[in-house]
Amino acid sequence: MNNIELLKNGIEGFNIDTNDSMLEKFKIYREILVDWNKKMNLTGIEDEKEVYIKHFLDSISAVKNGYIKNGMSIIDVGTGAGFPGIPLKICLDSLELTLLDSLNKRINFLEEVSRVLELDNVTFIHGRAEDFGKNEDYREKYDVATARAVAGLPILMEFCVPFVKVGGYFICLKGPNANLELEESQKAIDVLGLEYIEKIDVELPEVDLNHNILVFKKVMETPVKYPRKAGKPAKNPIK
């Protein structure tokens, strides 16, 4: 099986129909990623098969169990090289996607990817979640907030949850320590207005990686004091 077939089968395993145009977009995305990675640090993974599995399929796995659907508004917080937001957008082309990152160089990269791939309804925010989570144009405006960052779960919650509408979802892609992080997040869940829904185990082809998706529903408005000022959530997480 070649790499594009591996990607195709993986996407279809998440109950998403593929076509040649979609698969070509993923191929080009990876090429742009590798090219830009020469001048800035976007990823430690460049090999085609590894990018397809560990970045693209891992990102797309966020659709499992139906919390993300076409037509929804999504904000990807701390998106970095565009994960999971851009792979989700390629697969579900009527998503309204907002990509937020604190580094302008990464925003420039994301704008270039979106331009080349002709992705519509993508908004770019250069800034910190702590600042934009207070902005009434963005606060509690999204059906879903996603994160695939390395920060601890209570920190990610404070970054992401203020963006989510009541009734919407916070979906966090995590590694093997998801259960431990969940235990450490009970106070943040209560304070920020969340209800824990489920942990979804993700199996990716040809890699021995234990990935999990944590799903939370927003059941009440987030208190106005959150998010706290830039730097505070990381220095003093809600615990």
Q: What spans do the regions from the language model cover?
A:
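Conserved SAM/SAH cofactor-binding pocket of Class I
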Residues: I60-A151, M157
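Short alpha-helix immediately C-terminal to the canonical SAM-binding loop
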Residues: R106-N108, A178, L182
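Short "lid" loop at the C-terminus of a central beta-strand within the Rossmann-like core
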Residues: E130, G152, G175-N179, L204
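Conserved beta-strand signature within the Rossmann-like core of class I S-adenosyl-L-methionine
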Residues: G167-N177
